[in-house]
């Protein structure tokens, strides 16, 4: 019908009345909770400075705790607790201007004193911070005022802004630091509401955060699901809304062909490797380690462990990282060569070794593939499946193993080869000298050349079997927004997530 001024006015009033009635109800019904899943539960706690497991930072980094800088999915570094920073030409002096108006969950005001405390704590004698070497390079910390902190380094470090955005560089509050594992107190947008051991962690939005109004999710439940089939089932049933780093490669088609879901694939800086205990005989013999290398078909492992979602690597470095070189030809798949190397090393088959595998699917599935390949050259790998806490204490802590499979997700962890007490037991004076040169070099071209030399050295010495760089796979409901595509580090930035229309 035609609308007269009166009917238009009445229609406008009716519409206004309808909006007045429906608007609040619609706002109240807008989803502000989410269930996210991870493969592993954090151990031993939620303090990423107190344990090596990447699952710790996946729960707490950028959520409970914050850092001076923040690393995005595109690897771009921005300020978080630091508003800005400057650096001297020799990269030895970093001056950070801190963000004002920041408070910890316990009400304490954040200042430069907390940065000084946190970084000195990281390098203290009793510290177990896995990036202790980063902080040991700090010669002096100056705090000229509450909003300024100056880091004076022993050696120039071009990677420092990135390193200060990782979980090992969280800023903590002195009174609560000792109990951060179970009662974490940070400056982040979320607080720990509950931890149901063996099942889930619940985080709730902290209204005292400076950007609380921009945080869309009021509560996030993080479930722990290590079994690949159970991961798929939880997504299909709707029990889980988003699963970053999911082990669902074989089942991706059913998600890709379902409009209820989104599948996001991207790059990662992770390295999945077969670790060999270099301190144990006969693995202390490079010929035996090279034989194990030669016995393994990387592509078959990628198919069996990662459902084809990975790129072969020949050293402890992921494609796309600065200075990366392709070294997959250094220790190629060659079973005849593997047998010959074992013979040269005086090994009479069968050589029996234990392979302790954590509960993640890539390790369990990859272990079966590798054990079958090793058997063809006279090596019997006896598989022992262990839980994650057992792996952390027995394999990583006590070094009680011959072989194991794990994915190292930290992007800047090559320096672990210079740690003689690290769990793979590698010691090399030549590598240590080379790594000192890498750390002291600030020119990108020269640094990349030295990084290439470092990659070649650990490849030729076959410290571990470098298998593949895994593809990052996220499966989520179609309405979840803000998920990362690429994974330059293991983190779940919950403040960026929301529900779309």
Residue ranges and their predicted role:
Residues 76, 162-221, 227-229, 335-336, ...:
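Gly/Pro-rich hinge or "lid" segments in bacterial periplasmic/extracellular proteins
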Residues 204-208, 266-291, 418-421, 436-439, ...:
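A bilobed periplasmic-binding-protein/Venus flytrap-type ligand-binding module shared by bacterial periplasmic
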Residues 29, 97, 131-174, 194:
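Surface-exposed binding/hinge segments that line
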Residues 29-32, 196, 295-323, 362-371, ...:
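Detector for C-terminal structural segments
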Residues 37-89, 120, 185-186:
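N-terminal lobe/hinge region of extracytoplasmic solute-binding protein
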Residues 178, 208-253, 371, 380-382:
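Ligand-site clamp/hinge motif
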Residues 202-205, 257, 283-372, 453, ...:
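Append "and occasionally in soluble cytosolic enzymes with long acidic Gly/Pro-rich linkers
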Residues 83-128, 144, 150, 234, ...:
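Aromatic- and charge-enriched surface segment that lines or borders ligand/interaction sites
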């Amino acid at each position: 019908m035609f609308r007269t001024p009166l009917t238009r006015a009445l229609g406008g009033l009716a519409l206004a009345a309808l909006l007045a009635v429906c608007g609040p109800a619609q706002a109240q019904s807008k989803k502000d909770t989410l269930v996210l899943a991870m493969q592993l539960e954090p151990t031993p706690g939620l303090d990423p400075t107190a344990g090596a497991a990447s699952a710790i930072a996946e729960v707490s980094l950028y959520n409970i705790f914050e850092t001076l800088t923040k690393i995005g999915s595109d690897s771009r570094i921005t300020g978080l607790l630091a508003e800005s920073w400057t650096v001297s030409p020799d990269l030895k002096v970093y001056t950070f201007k801190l963000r004002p108006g920041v408070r910890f969950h316990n009400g304490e005001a954040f200042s430069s004193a907390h940065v000084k405390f946190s970084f000195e704590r990281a390098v203290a004698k009793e510290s177990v911070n896995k990036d202790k070497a980063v902080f040991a390079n700090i010669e002096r910390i100056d705090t000229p005022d509450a909003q300024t902190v100056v880091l004076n380094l022993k050696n120039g470090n071009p990677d420092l802004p990135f390193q200060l955005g990782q979980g090992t560089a969280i800023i903590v509050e002195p009174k609560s630091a000792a109990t951060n594992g179970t009662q974490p107190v940070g400056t982040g947008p979320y607080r720990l509401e509950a931890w149901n051991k063996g099942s889930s962690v619940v985080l709730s939005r902290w209204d005292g955060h400076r950007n609380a109004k921009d945080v869309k999710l009021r509560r996030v439940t993080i479930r722990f699901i290590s079994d690949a089939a159970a991961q798929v089932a939880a997504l299909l049933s709707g029990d889980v809304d988003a699963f970053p780093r999911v082990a669902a490669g074989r089942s991706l088609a059913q998600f890709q062909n379902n409009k209820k879901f989104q599948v996001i694939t991207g790059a990662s800086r992770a390295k999945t490797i077969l670790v060999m205990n270099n301190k144990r005989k006969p693995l202390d013999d490079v010929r035996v380690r090279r034989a194990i290398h030669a016995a393994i078909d990387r592509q078959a492992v990628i198919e069996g462990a990662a459902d084809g979602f990975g790129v072969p690597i020949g050293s402890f470095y992921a494609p796309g990282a600065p200075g990366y070189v392709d070294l997959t030809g250094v220790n190629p798949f060659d079973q005849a060569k593997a047998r010959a190397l074992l013979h040269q090393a005086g090994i009479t088959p069968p050589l029996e070794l234990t392979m302790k595998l954590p509960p993640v699917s890539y390790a369990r599935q990859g272990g079966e593939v590798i054990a079958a390949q090793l058997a063809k050259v006279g090596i019997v790998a006896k598989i022992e499946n262990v839980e994650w806490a057992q792996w952390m204490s027995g394999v990583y802590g006590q070094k009680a193993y011959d072989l194991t499979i794990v994915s190292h997700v930290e992007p800047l962890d090559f320096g672990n080869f210079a740690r003689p007490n690290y769990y793979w037991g590698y010691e090399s004076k030549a590598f240590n000298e080379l790594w000192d040169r890498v750390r002291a070099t600030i020119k990108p071209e020269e640094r990349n050349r030295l990084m290439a030399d470092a990659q070649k050295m650990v490849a030729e010495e076959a410290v571990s079997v470098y298998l593949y760089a895994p593809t990052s796979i996220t499966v989520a409901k179609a309405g979840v927004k803000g998920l990362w595509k690429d994974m330059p580090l293991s983190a779940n930035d919950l403040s960026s997530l929301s529900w779309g229309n």
